[in-house]
């Protein structure tokens, strides 16, 4: 007999999907949403949802690595007494919980070549080499105290695909991901932001932005439908229509 705990189950990060569904149902049923025992079925696919979640976070974190290091999130005094130090570390880590694979840690020692951090349960991790590059500006003697990585600093760390550790930071930028079946309009995956617990604003359904170049495929497809090909030559010389053509003011688009 094998007992399977809740911890054995994989977490499906579909928080933005669930909140979007809740809002839609609430708009129709009001407070009865929470008492009618409704079952809601979506077209979201678990495997595709997780792939979208990981892809969005990876893309944002890759962007974050190219940004200047903004400094530790907090600084604490580390008592000399080991038990008091452990309690102080546990308290600050509880106040700043892990964000997915972006983990919180407290610095025990720091130099331009090596940083030693500690996690809960006194787990120590040494970070060297490329793992220090994203935060190199925070390890200089000339760095302002508020941005310097030093003993007692609360920092973020993450593990690279190769298994090495590196210092990172929670991103300030946001992003969104939606995958739709064009034939039916079914939503296969939806991620409204980097972290639902941090920011519940859904950048898929609530953000209003200029479409930019994303509109170009519609123009290209309309041109292809009318017989244009990649080899078609289009005369893009300036146009000018005088008053005789317009019947009023000259017009130059």
Where are these regions (language model features)?
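Glycine-rich, acidic and aromatic/proline-enriched surface loops and short helix-turn segments
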Residues: 17, 22-23, 179-194, 224-228, ...
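Beta-lactamase-like hydrolase cores
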Residues: 63, 67-71, 93-102, 141-148, ...
């Amino acid at each position: 007999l094998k007992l399977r705990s809740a911890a054995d189950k994989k977490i499906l990060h579909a928080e933005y999907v669930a909140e979007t569904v809740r809002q839609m149902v609430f708009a129709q049923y009001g407070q009865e949403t929470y008492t009618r025992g409704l079952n809601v079925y979506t077209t979201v696919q678990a495997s595709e949802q997780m792939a979208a979640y990981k892809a969005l976070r990876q893309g944002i974190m890759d962007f974050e690595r190219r940004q200047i290091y903004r400094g530790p999130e907090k600084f604490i005094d580390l008592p000399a007494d080991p038990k008091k130090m452990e309690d102080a570390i546990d308290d600050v880590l509880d106040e700043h919980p892990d964000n997915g694979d972006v983990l919180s840690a407290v610095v025990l020692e720091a130099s331009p070549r090596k940083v030693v951090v500690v996690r809960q349960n006194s787990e120590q991790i040494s970070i060297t080499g490329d793992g220090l590059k994203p935060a190199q500006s925070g390890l200089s003697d000339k760095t302002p105290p508020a941005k310097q990585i030093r003993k007692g600093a609360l920092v973020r760390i993450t593990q690279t695909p190769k298994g090495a550790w590196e210092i990172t930071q929670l991103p300030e930028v946001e992003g969104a991901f939606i995958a739709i079946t064009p034939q039916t309009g079914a939503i296969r995956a939806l991620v409204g932001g980097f972290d639902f617990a941090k920011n519940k604003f859904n950048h898929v359904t609530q953000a209003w932005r200029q479409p930019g170049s994303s509109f170009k495929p519609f123009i290209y497809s309309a041109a292809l439908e009318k017989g244009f090909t990649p080899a078609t030559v289009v005369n893009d010389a300036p146009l000018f229509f005088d008053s005789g053509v317009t019947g009023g003011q000259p017009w130059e688009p």
